Amino acid sequence: LKEPSSTATPVPAASGGVAAEQASAADIPSLEGKTVGIAAKDIVHDFSRVVYDTVQERVEELGGEVIATQAEAKENKHVSDVENLIAQKPDAIIVILGDTTTLGPALEKVNEAGIPLFTIDFQSEYSVNNVTSDNWVIGSTVARTIAEDIGGEGQILVFNGFTGVTPCRIRYSELEVVLEDYPKVKLIQPELQDKYEGTVEDAKQQVNDALRRFPEGEIDAVWSCWDIPQIGAAQAIDAAGRDEIKVYGVDAEPGALDMIADPESSFTATVAQQTTAMGTQSADNVALFLSGATEEVPTTSYLEPVFIDKDNVDEVRNELGI
């Protein structure tokens, strides 16, 4: 992938965002006597599990108490988890991932209860701060890489089942923007709809069906906003011997990295997010805010992504320990 340099990572001026820098616990105000509620959508996948564990560890390291819930990827449970946290009157609530439409009313209740809301990879009008990767950079860089890798001409099979999830919405939007400058690159319609449970097998079946509909030369790449469906996609493509098709994802899931490291696999590239840093940064922002240092807490804390392809996968895995 065409990795941007650290000085080239843009932060939208209107967002109030900053590129987040990690601080030691000694530099962050104590959370002693404070209780922080944590509501995660799930801990099914590596990304959400690491963030969930890390934010709890950091709150406790800063002296705070944690009330942690995870919704097992069930939207209704995620809503009820947030509502149950409100009833326990914590000093702050951190929500990890979620669907904007489904969670909106519950987050409005958090706001009405006067409880500061913090989010991770989930934008909300009620959030004091959202910690996230720079999804505009992720989306545009992956899109440009695909377009260049297929020679500026061809057809892309797309998984687009999570339009209500902020990172996916942004990454897909950037794909559309980039392709405006590649008029010979088309998105295959109708787009595929990825699922959150049974993702790999479902995606594998959908791509198998697509391979039957579109013979060799009619699919050049497969795009998704995350890695899990792409593992199934790559399995289907590799089993069919369709080595003309390249697969691209986001999240640097271990299974995806293993496939990228395999020169025979169609899985071509992914993007690592700084999951440990995201959890730590969110807890630090809570501590700063509750201490009264509100001016030190931006609307959005952006963490720089790391782009991984077949050329650098081993090096990046060693450097990041993934």
What are the residue ranges of the model-derived segments?
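A residue-level marker of the well-folded mature domains of exported/periplasmic proteins
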Residues: L1-I322
